[in-house]
Amino acid sequence: MVLDVLDNFGKYAALNPYFSLVDAFMRTHQLEELALGTYNIKGEDVVLKIEQAMGKSRTEAILESHRQMIDIQIPLQQEETIGLAATVSLPAADYSAEKDISFYPNSPVQNYVTCPRGGFVIFFPQDAHAPCISEDASFTKAIFKVRCV
């Protein structure tokens, strides 16, 4: 997991060859001005989702993980708190290959991070995360889905 400010995103380009495409997209587009929806940046290898997320309490948020895609999550309006756990420490969970997701509904969060507006969090396959923890009823966020290579 990586937590940093957007101005530093380019420093992480060496972690995945597709990260440079994400960086270039963010430098040429104002994410806050994009309409809700899905944007294919490079086929299914790099996809951006702008979505209206529903705020959850810490007890409502459920851990999830992905095997094929890396999540780069960016709160666009205000900070967002996200629960964390290492997948190696979690019990086996059903996996949907179609949606590339496993849920861990009865597993405890090990830690929390708060991503500020102007920041981002990168979640790799080993990083289970419980997103959308916020006191606000709803908020807008950007999620880049980047294929693991």
Feature locations, PLM:
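A short, N-terminal "cap"/entry segment at the start of jelly-roll beta-barrel domains
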Residues: 2-49, 57-65
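Short, charged/polar surface micro-motifs in flexible loops or helix N-caps
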Residues: 46, 53-56, 77-81
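Short, structured patches in soluble enzyme cores that scaffold and shape functional sites
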Residues: 52, 125-127, 133, 144-148
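A generic structural micro-feature
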Residues: 64-66, 136-138
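Glycine- and acidic-residue-biased ligand/ion/polar-headgroup-sensing regions
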Residues: 68-70, 74-84, 88-90, 97-103
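A short hydrophobic beta-strand segment most commonly corresponding to one strand
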Residues: 72, 120-122, 137-149
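Short beta-strand His + acidic residue motifs that chelate non-heme Fe in jelly-roll/DSBH
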Residues: 82-83, 111-114, 128-135
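Conserved metal-binding segment of the jelly-roll/cupin
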Residues: 104, 113-128
